[in-house]
Amino acid sequence: MKPSWLQCHKVTSAGGLGGPLPGSSPARGASAALRALVVPGPRGGLGGRGCRALSSGSGSEYKTHFAASVTDPERFWGKAAEQISWYKPWTKTLENKHSPSTSWFVEGMLNVCYNAVDRHIENGKGDKIAIIYDSPVTNTKATFTYKEVLEQVSKLAGVLVKHGIKKGDTVVIYMPMIPQAMYTMLACARIGAIHSLIFGGFASKELSSRIDHVKPKVVVTASFGIEPGRRVEYVPLVEEALKIGQHKPDKILIYNRPNMEAVPLAPGRDLDWDEEMAKAQSHDCVPVLSEHPLYILYTSGTTGLPKGVIRPTGGYAVMLNWSMSSIYGLQPGEVWWAASDLGWVVGHSYICYGPLLHGNTTVLYEGKPVGTPDAGAYFRVLAEHGVAALFTAPTAIRAIRQQDPGAALGKQYSLTRFKTLFVAGERCDVETLEWSKNVFRVPVLDHWWQTETGSPITASCVGLGNSKTPPPGQAGKSVPGYNVMILDDNMQKLKARCLGNIVVKLPLPPGAFSGLWKNQEAFKHLYFEKFPGYYDTMDAGYMDEEGYVYVMSRVDDVINVAGHRISAGAIEESILSHGTVADCAVVGKEDPLKGHVPLALCVLRKDINATEEQVLEEIVKHVRQNIGPVAAFRNAVFVKQLPKTRSGKIPRSALSAIVNGKPYKITSTIEDPSIFGHVEEMLKQA
């Protein structure tokens, strides 16, 4: 039940789950801002299946939406916000009082947990499946309805409140890929607590720095994380982090995983999850202001203070709900799978909050693309659960291809409900893209975004009629709200197909970060000082004549070869397109004549019989044909594996340091740190 005083004040969308029937008059947040922008589709909202079904793929609807989002963002996002339920209407849709940060839906009050769970139950969807938990590492499969999720989340919210957590307090979540991690996120959102979810298994030193920075009253953890072939003991890692650091939380809530030994509790500090839940009282949703932080998510950063991205509640809810239909083309009720980790922004946005806000079924997968048990794992999950759309990283596809080049394991599964494969997290080379299309037999769409934005910056907006067969190598067009431009270092706009700095003209749309936790100076300096009036993505790329954006590399990964700026990503793309190399990373090696020359670290495909010398000769010739002699590419070192972060990114700065014989730091997000030693050894032998 909601507090009674709120019931008559709740503003609900037209056409969304929980809204009045199409044709009824929706309540208004700020009347002028909420007038209908375009003729609504069959569900009365922006985008969605109705728009997609009528689309010819010409993108005319996309063009209308993008233009409206740029010329009149207040009206555009005001309309989208009607699909979210509000306790109190906003007085102003957009405000730039604290530039460069933009405030959205000023003075509006809402609750994300209510929008993600309660409202679906109130509108007769309580028995629909909210979460499918698929854990090959524990041989467990389970489903949870929206009603069952609400029961767990509301009780857990009661546990947190009982132990002193109130609106505005911080909670650190340090858990594996289990439903209880999502329950904790939602329980925090329910009571207005700010969660900071940190990868389960994260090293104690890094965990300690984040605990010291966010100063949680409570840490929520689990007894073990399960990796292929091993268990990770979480509680000793937490204990070590607390010894290293200064801050001590009041309580540690521990979930003991079933069928494993229980961990001992520290008297007076530790709480047993099951015992607390057994005696818990359910807790209602607490309204929060639109700008209230929903979570703090730490991202890779520079030296100094950790870089904790602050996510504002209202704009995030609006953007995620809108994106599920307009970008990803899903109807409520369809099954969605973001094959990521909850610790990444993809996990926050598109395992937990996005699909639940939109009334979808979300797959929570505790496994890997290969090795749990084999390269057919993704195909099994897609077939077994009737997944409509999958979101994964190109590195996962490359891993599957390397293990099973012909996808023999995948071909045994029928993917009748599977419609679209979205990839992001790193550049998707054309070779991987084409292989994916041939194997999965669905459109494969690359798109691009960042932890800071919380949702895509560029994409093929399926729900708005964008082409499902865009040119190879692109990452989509500017998502409505993101006015993307390519500038040189002097802030001059570049012509089509000229490599430059990718920036976004302000204001940033709803859902983008509102700051860095306890570090607003860095927020302004890092993102907004170099190009005043723009958000600096710190990525390099270009835009073609049709508006497709090609993200080539981080600005730092542009290699200066004798005065020519060469994208490392372009060379990688060329190498991978040859077909003999399964994975590669290109870095700049210092050269006394040219300044830098590109060096490739390559992983050969398993089915290649040629010698390394033959392959090197071939790929050098191939790069020369594709990019030209200006790239000065002549050298490659062959390794058995490349180091990757858990989200599939290659740590190029560390590899560049190794190649140039300089000290380097192994960050705690690296999946297997031992690979660095292997790379060093191969470089010595080369």
From Swiss-Prot:
| An example Gene Ontology biological process | lipid metabolic process
PTM N6-acetyllysine: list the residues: K524
Write out the annotated subcellular location. Mitochondrion matrix
Top-level division of the source organism's lineage? Eukaryota
| Keyword Translocase (UniProt) | no
Reaction(s) this enzyme catalyzes, per UniProt: acetate + ATP + CoA = acetyl-CoA + AMP + diphosphate; propanoate + ATP + CoA = propanoyl-CoA + AMP + diphosphate; butanoate + ATP + CoA = butanoyl-CoA + AMP + diphosphate
EC category name: ligase
Enzyme Commission identifier(s):
6.2.1.1, 6.2.1.17
Any one GO molecular function term: ATP binding
Indicate which residues the UniProt annotation says bind ATP. G425, E426, R427, D446, H447, W448, W449, Q450, T451, D539, R554, R565
- Any one GO cellular component localisation term in the record: mitochondrial matrix
Could you list this entry's UniProt keywords, alphabetically sorted: Acetylation, ATP-binding, Ligase, Lipid metabolism, Mitochondrion, Nucleotide-binding, Transit peptide
Which residue positions does N6-succinyllysine occur at? K518
Question: Where, by residue number, does CoA bind?
Answer: E227, P228, G229, R230, R624
Q: Which Gene3D superfamilies match?
A: 3.30.300.30, N-terminal domain of ligase-like
The transit peptide segment here is: 1-29
Its biological purpose: Catalyzes the synthesis of acetyl-CoA from short-chain fatty acids. Propionate is the preferred substrate but can also utilize acetate and butyrate with a much lower affinity.
PANTHER family (UniProt xref): ACYL-COA SYNTHETASE (PTHR43347), ACYL-COA SYNTHETASE SHORT-CHAIN FAMILY MEMBER 3, MITOCHONDRIAL (PTHR43347:SF3)
Family indicated by similarity: Belongs to the ATP-dependent AMP-binding enzyme family.
Its name, as the record gives it, is Acyl-CoA synthetase short-chain family member 3, mitochondrial
Originating organism: Pongo abelii (Sumatran orangutan)
